[in-house]
């Protein structure tokens, strides 16, 4: 539930998550020509770990996360200088809040979409928020058997909607939203309870 993310926020940034953020940022940098002018929107940004890793390679950063606890940690990082002073921290929930007016050259969402039961409105919002040449980068679990979130209270209503994604199926959902997508598998392994779970990177551009 959302409150469980609030509770976890203060101790969220452990070594494994920092390493994951670094691997994700490097995979994105390898797949997308990053520019210091690019406006970055990270959805489900948590404490801003991925944005921290990308900050020196992109322009102004906007972080969105529905968890107040996560936003508080992200805002503390801005105050402390680990994220640029111009960084904005939003509580926007694209599934319910409507689409922001702002436009972005780069939208990143990491380990977030598997929490979203109703993807089409969120993918449509991404399409609207992205500039014509912009890139949407999705990093998530490759389809798994449900064990990744077993016992984390994720099944209770909010939270866990998908046991990861078959990247091809996600690409089809993205096509419905007007995107062309290329997928890179196994950009990083997340280890949990002694098992390794691969992450994929999907990079999408809007169809002209």
Which residue stretches match the model-derived regions?
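A short SAM/SAH-binding and catalytic strip from SAM-dependent methyltransferases
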Residues: 105-118
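Class I SAM-dependent methyltransferase SAM/SAH-binding core
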Residues: 41-97
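A short glycine-rich, Lys/Arg-flanked "PGG" loop and its adjoining helix->strand segment in the class I
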Residues: 120-132
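C-terminal alpha-helical "lid/dimerization" subdomain adjacent to the S-adenosyl-L-methionine
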Residues: 13-19, 135-203
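A short acidic, Gly/Pro-enriched loop at the edge of an enzyme's catalytic core
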Residues: 95-107
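Conserved class I S-adenosyl-L-methionine
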Residues: 1-36, 50, 73, 80-81, ...
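Residues lining the SAM
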Residues: 64, 110-113, 139
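Short glycine-centered segments of the SAM/dcSAM-binding site in methyltransferase folds
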Residues: 39, 60, 133-135
């Amino acid at each position: 539930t959302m409150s469980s993310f609030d509770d976890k926020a203060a101790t969220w940034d452990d070594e494994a998550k920092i390493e994951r953020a670094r691997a994700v940022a490097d995979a994105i940098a390898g797949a997308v020509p990053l520019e210091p002018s690019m406006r970055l929107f990270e959805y489900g940004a948590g404490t801003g770990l991925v944005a921290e890793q990308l900050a020196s390679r992109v322009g102004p950063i906007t972080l969105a996360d529905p968890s107040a606890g996560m936003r508080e940690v992200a805002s503390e990082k801005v105050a402390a200088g680990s994220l640029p002073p111009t960084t904005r921290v939003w509580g926007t929930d694209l599934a319910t809040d409507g689409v922001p007016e702002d436009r972005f050259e780069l939208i990143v969402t990491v380990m977030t979409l598997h929490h979203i039961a109703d993807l089409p409105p969120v993918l449509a919002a991404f399409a609207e928020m992205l500039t014509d040449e912009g890139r949407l980068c999705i990093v998530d679990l490759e389809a798994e058997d449900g064990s990744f979130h077993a016992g984390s209270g994720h099944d209770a209503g909010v939270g866990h909607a998908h046991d990861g994604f078959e990247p091809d199926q996600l690409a089809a959902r993205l096509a419905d939203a007007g995107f062309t997508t290329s997928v890179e598998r196994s950009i990083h392994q997340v280890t949990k309870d002694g098992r390794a779970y691969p992450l994929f990177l999907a990079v999408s551009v809007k169809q002209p």
